[in-house]
Every structure is written in C-alpha cells, then in structure tokens.
C-alpha cells in the first residue's frame, strides 16, 4: 500500500493501550513489536514509544529510555483520552522532563470535546510553558480548539481532523486555518486506518483531493508531506 501511494516512510503511533498492540499486554512488549517492525522494514518507519499509566511515572520514564536507546524508537506518544490522565497531570511531568532534556519529540493526542477535556488545548499551552523547548507535535491540530495553539512553538499534524475541518468550514476556511499555523509547522498525517467518517480505502484519496484544492506551492507541499517530519525526526 505504501508503495502504491508513493509513501517512502510512515510513522507508527501507539495508543497508550498495550492491550491493542501486543499479546503480552505490557508496554515493553509494545516497544519490542515496534522495534521489530522497524527492523523488518529498514528505513520505512518511524515509531513512537508508548506509555502505560498502570505503571508509575518512574517506570514509564525507564521504559521510554529503553524504547529510545534499546529499541531505536523515535519519540513519545501521549494519548490522554485513552489513559484517562490529563495532559498536565503530575504523572506526565517526569516524561516531559525527560523529553525536554533528551530533545525527544512528543506527540500529543488532542481532539477535545469540552473545555475541561483531558486533552484540551489549554493543557498543551500550560505544558509548553512549564517545559520550554519541548519538541511538541499536536495530533489532530487540537481539533476545534486550534486557535489556542497558534502562539505556541509546536508542530501540528492534520490526522483525523482535515476532513472534519472541510466538512465544517469548507475548503477556503480550512486552507486559511492551515496557513495560519505556517507551512513549517504542518505535518501530513492521516490516522490511517481510523477515521470518524471515511472507510480506510477512501482515506488517502480524500486527503489528497482536499489538499489539491489548496494554494500551497510545490515546495510548500513537499515541506508538509515529508520535509518537516524529516527535520523533526531525523
């Protein structure tokens, strides 16, 4: 599939739920599975470390260090809505401190439905202020709280949210939203195979059709498609 769509390299994101990504149901097993996928298909995947909030913060930090140093993983994924732990909860503070110190990119799920959601954009702002220089990737662009993220030094990926923006705002306004972040902050992402409205087989064609209607130059499209991610992840 990747070859058919001219995708040279993809990012595998865990879900902060080891029951979904291993048969041993442990975060270490998830990390080994991700390592094995990277090794089986060399040069084709980035993969982010998982967290399991059944473990202590210290245990999660140790597992991330092993995932990055021992398994060759490329970042950390935090999905507050799956863990049930608010992004700015003290549980996550040692994880952010490690990422800040080691300059490890952190991808944060943010598709909040309320102003007090565990992944609300305001919690991302609070975290960024507490840990300056943290390399943040906000997945789903903070959904419909995107304006809160505009002042932050963070990257945003358009996974899941791009078709929802078009459905809500139309192409022109969606184009304006993407432009408001600046091309250098935008990351192409699809959340494949998941989507609230589209079946997996229609996902990429839908994304391509939407982006083809926007005013990005060829050079800007390359930055969004892969250059920004390459600079961030190596």
Question: For the regions a protein language model found, what residue spans apply to each?
Answer:
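Mid-to-C-terminal alpha-helical segments outside catalytic/metal-binding sites
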Residues: 1-9, 182-185, 199-234
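Short helix-capping segments at alpha-helix termini
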Residues: 39-44, 130-134, 152-153, 181, ...
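Flexible loop residues that form catalytic
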Residues: 15-18, 81, 141-142, 161, ...
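Conserved residues at the C-terminal ends of beta-strands
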Residues: 13, 79, 139, 189
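Active-site gating/metal-coordination segments in enzymes
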Residues: 9, 18, 24-107, 113-114, ...
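Conserved, mostly hydrophobic/aromatic
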Residues: 2, 34, 67, 76, ...
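A general structural detector for well-ordered alpha-helical segments in enzyme core domains, enriched
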Residues: 1, 30-37, 63-67, 91-95, ...
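Catalytic pocket-lining loop regions of alpha/beta-barrel enzymes
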Residues: 74-75, 85-187
């Amino acid at each position: 599939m990747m070859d058919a769509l001219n995708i040279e390299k993809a990012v595998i994101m865990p879900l902060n739920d080891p029951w979904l990504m291993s048969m041993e149901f442990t975060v270490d097993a998830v990390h080994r599975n991700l390592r094995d996928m990277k090794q089986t298909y060399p040069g084709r995947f980035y993969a982010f470390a998982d967290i399991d909030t059944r473990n202590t913060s210290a245990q999660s930090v140790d597992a991330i260090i092993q995932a990055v140093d021992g398994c060759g993983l490329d970042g950390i994924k935090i999905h507050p809505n799956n863990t049930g732990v608010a992004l700015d909860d003290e549980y996550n503070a040692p994880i952010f401190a490690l990422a800040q110190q080691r300059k490890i990119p952190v991808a944060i799920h943010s598709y909040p439905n309320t102003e007090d959601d565990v992944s609300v954009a305001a919690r991302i702002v609070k975290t960024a202020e507490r840990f300056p220089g943290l390399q943040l990737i906000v997945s789903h662009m903070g959904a419909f709280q995107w304006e809160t993220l505009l002042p932050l030094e963070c990257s945003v990926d358009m996974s899941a949210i791009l078709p929802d923006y078009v459905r809500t705002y139309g192409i022109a306004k969606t184009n304006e939203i993407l432009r408001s972040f600046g091309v250098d902050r935008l990351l192409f992402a699809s959340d494949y195979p998941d989507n609230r409205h589209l079946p997996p087989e229609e996902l990429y064609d839908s994304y391509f059709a939407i982006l083809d209607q926007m005013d990005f130059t060829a050079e800007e499209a390359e930055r969004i498609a892969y250059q920004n991610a390459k600079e961030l992840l190596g």
